[in-house]
Design a protein with these regions (language model features):
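Structural/interface elements that position substrates and couple domains in central-metabolism enzymes
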Residues: 1-156
Length: 156
């Protein structure tokens, strides 16, 4: 079973790199992240690949704003602390999360030149359809239906 786990790590890293490359191709000054937690319905950031994406975007000088229904101003500090303990390389980012987190989707999208969606929620699908900037969809928002022209999907 160990080789499979190792290949999963490589696959996850490749997906992270692919998402970053797709976002960088849009040459954004600011990226909105819709969905921070490892999966929808939780505030657990510990295994969340989007944190690695955000860190790489910031290394490229890109501003970030984010929204998550379950990672809220009330729990983000605690959630980020847990994530930083499992991913030491992301400690700086985890300390910044309270400033990056927006209370509503509209605030997160304001001024964004690109969007990445990590949770397949109806309100995130609606936002992806309504923005006029590139959207990287890692949540398979439009699975089985036509994807809007501004969306590129890569599920992870």
């Amino acid at each position: 079973a160990l080789p499979l786990i190792g290949s999963l790590d490589q696959s996850n890293l490749a997906q992270i790199d692919r998402a970053v490359a797709m976002l960088l191709a849009a040459r954004p000054r600011k990226v909105a992240v819709l969905g921070l937690a490892f999966k929808p319905g939780t505030n657990d950031l510990r295994e969340s690949p989007i944190l690695d994406v955000i860190a790489q975007l910031q290394e490229n000088g890109i501003d970030i704003s984010a929204h998550d229904h379950f990672v809220t101003p009330d729990n983000v500090v605690e959630s980020a602390r847990h994530a930083a303990s499992t991913k030491p390389g992301l400690q700086d980012l985890c300390q910044q999360l309270p400033q990056l987190l927006q209370e509503d989707i509209e605030s997160a999208l304001q001024g964004a030149d690109a969007v990445i969606v990590t949770h397949a929620l109806p309100e995130y699908r609606k936002a992806a359809q309504e923005v006029f900037v590139p959207v990287v969809d890692v949540a398979r928002l439009f699975s089985g239906q036509a994807e809007p022209e501004n969306c590129q999907g890569i599920g992870w």
